[in-house]
């Protein structure tokens, strides 16, 4: 792993400009409102989380998979490759990169089938339609898009250091850690360095736990305006999440989501590959 975030591909290539991100997203916002797009982000992050938990992966592996997923759709429309295929592909790749060990083909397909059937049947009434050849092809497109820049830095390590420095590990760490997990349901991992996200999550945890840490934050040599920007995104997430009924809303949102054509079928593999290739070639 690159030892210095500031010299890493994560910082040099994958901290994106917000306006560029929104510009790329306009193709999808012809079909979805901004709020519906947010809800899709929350939903597919939940799918990746459920897949990772089913496979008993560490949280860092799940977080890396989520970042890969977001990186792909930061550059390409949802219709380029079906997110239902991209989600397990990201889990498959992240498990290798994070040295968790390769998830076997059988386990991966079994997990995706089981999770969609038991946890998300309200959104996906049909069986998981993909097989390992689709996952491997999708992985190729994902690797090409990311230019093989696979090392991802996360807020977990800096968060642990900050909480220890503050001397409030037992009081603040569990809540701040959960808030970090929740930030992966937003664009924050594409827009800000992980240490800033860690500080913002710690700030929110301090407010919730009524811990006065103003002096500690005042002594940091960090742009507090950016920390406040991140906090606003976190608060917006919780506000939207509170009013989001996945079971009632997702089937309708997914029906509006732009999709690759034609969908895969038992003898239409060429069509699937063609749709992914043509979608991938759009810039």
Swiss-Prot record:
Domain of life: Eukaryota
Keyword Calcium: no
Record has RNA-binding as a keyword: no
Region of interest (Disordered), residue spans: 252-283
Keywords: Activator, Cyclin, Nucleus, Repressor, Transcription, Transcription regulation
Protein's GO biological process: positive regulation of transcription by RNA polymerase II
GO cellular component, one term: nucleus
Domain called Cyclin N-terminal: residue spans: 46-144
MF annotations from Gene Ontology: cyclin-dependent protein serine/threonine kinase regulator activity
Compartments, as annotated in UniProt: Nucleus
Chain intervals with Polar residues compositional bias: 267-283
InterPro entries tied to this protein: Cyclin-like_dom (IPR013763), Cyclin-like_sf (IPR036915), Cyclin/Ssn8 (IPR043198), Cyclin_C_2 (IPR031658), Cyclin_N (IPR006671)
Sequence similarity: Belongs to the cyclin family. Cyclin C subfamily.
Function: Component of the Mediator complex, a coactivator involved in regulated gene transcription of nearly all RNA polymerase II-dependent genes. Mediator functions as a bridge to convey information from gene-specific regulatory proteins to the basal RNA polymerase II transcription machinery. Mediator is recruited to promoters by direct interactions with regulatory proteins and serves as a scaffold for the assembly of a functional preinitiation complex with RNA polymerase II and the general transcription factors.
Subunit structure: Component of the Mediator complex. The cylin/CDK pair formed by ccnc/cdk8 also associates with the large subunit of RNA polymerase II.
Protein known as: Cyclin-C
Organism: Xenopus laevis (African clawed frog)
């Amino acid at each position: 792993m690159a030892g210095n975030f500031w010299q890493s591909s994560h910082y040099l290539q994958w901290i994106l400009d917000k306006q560029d991100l929104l510009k790329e997203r306009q193709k999808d916002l012809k079909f979805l409102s901004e709020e519906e797009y947010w809800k899709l982000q929350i939903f597919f992050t939940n799918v990746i989380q459920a897949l990772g938990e089913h496979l008993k992966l560490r949280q860092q592996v799940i977080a890396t998979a989520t970042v890969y997923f977001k990186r792909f759709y930061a550059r390409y429309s949802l219709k380029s490759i079906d997110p239902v295929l991209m989600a397990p592909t990201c889990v498959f790749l992240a498990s290798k990169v994070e040295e968790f060990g390769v998830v076997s083909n059988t386990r991966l397909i079994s997990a995706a089938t089981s999770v969609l059937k038991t946890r998300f049947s309200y959104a996906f009434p049909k069986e998981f339609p993909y097989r390992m050849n689709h996952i491997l092809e999708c992985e190729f497109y994902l690797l090409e898009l990311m230019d093989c820049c696979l090392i991802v830095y996360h807020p977990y390590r800096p968060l642990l250091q900050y909480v220890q420095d503050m001397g409030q590990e037992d009081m603040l760490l569990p809540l701040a850690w959960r808030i970090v997990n929740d930030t992966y349901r937003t664009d924050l991992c594409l827009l800000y360095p992980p240490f800033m996200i860690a500080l913002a999550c710690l700030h929110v945890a301090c407010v919730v736990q009524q811990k006065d840490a103003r002096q500690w934050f005042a002594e940091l040599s960090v742009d507090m305006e950016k920390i406040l920007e991140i906090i606003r995104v976190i608060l917006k997430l919780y506000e939207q999440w509170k009013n989001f009924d996945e079971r009632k809303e997702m089937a309708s949102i997914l029906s509006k989501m732009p999709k690759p054509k034609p969908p895969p079928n038992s003898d239409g593999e060429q069509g699937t590959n063609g749709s992914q290739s043509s979608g991938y070639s759009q810039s």
